Amino acid sequence: MYKLDTDNKDHNSIIFWFKTWENKVQNKDYESAKILFENHVVSFGTWMNVVEGLEKLCANQWKSVWPTINNFKFLTDTLYIQISPDRLLANSIVIWDSTGCKKNGNSFKRNGRATVTLKRNNINDTWKCIHTHFSLNRGIPQKSYSSI
């Protein structure tokens, strides 16, 4: 029912949103990433418990994590998508992967899961994120120390 359907136009537009954000994370492109989000975004993260607002999300979550990881990737084939009947609100869950760096300089697999809520004003608009919740998988170190 909520599994990814690559024949669904809305699902494909959401895949595109995730791939676009993935590219911004990989390139540490904070300013371009902001375009994908509403200013009033509210989030949970691996670094922040609760963060309100895009500027705080960027300063306190993204800039604390992105410089310390590499190979960030949303595994979009794991996407589950719930779309409202009017097709203006979507809730997605997805698995993600990255490479972190231990204090001693050794790399480690840094993976987890995310819930992302997107909205748009009409079905021809691009999606904007209003909520994210990122969690590391069990047993994954909470901190990555430097870019690899």
Regions found by a protein language model. Name each.
Residues 11-12, 30-88:
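A solvent-exposed, acidic/Ser-Thr-rich amphipathic alpha-helical stretch
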Residues 73, 88-92, 110-112:
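Residue-level preference for beta-strand/loop junctions
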Residues 21, 61-62, 76-82, 96-98, ...:
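Hydrophobic/aromatic beta-strand elements that line small-molecule binding cavities or substrate pockets
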Residues 110-146:
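Short beta-strand edge/turn micro-motifs at domain boundaries
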Residues 1-39, 145-148:
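Short, low-complexity N-terminal intrinsically disordered segments enriched in polar/charged residues
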Residues 69, 98-109:
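Short, cysteine-centered beta-strand-loop-beta hairpins and adjacent loop/turn segments enriched
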Residues 2, 99-104, 139-141:
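A short, acidic/glycine-rich surface segment
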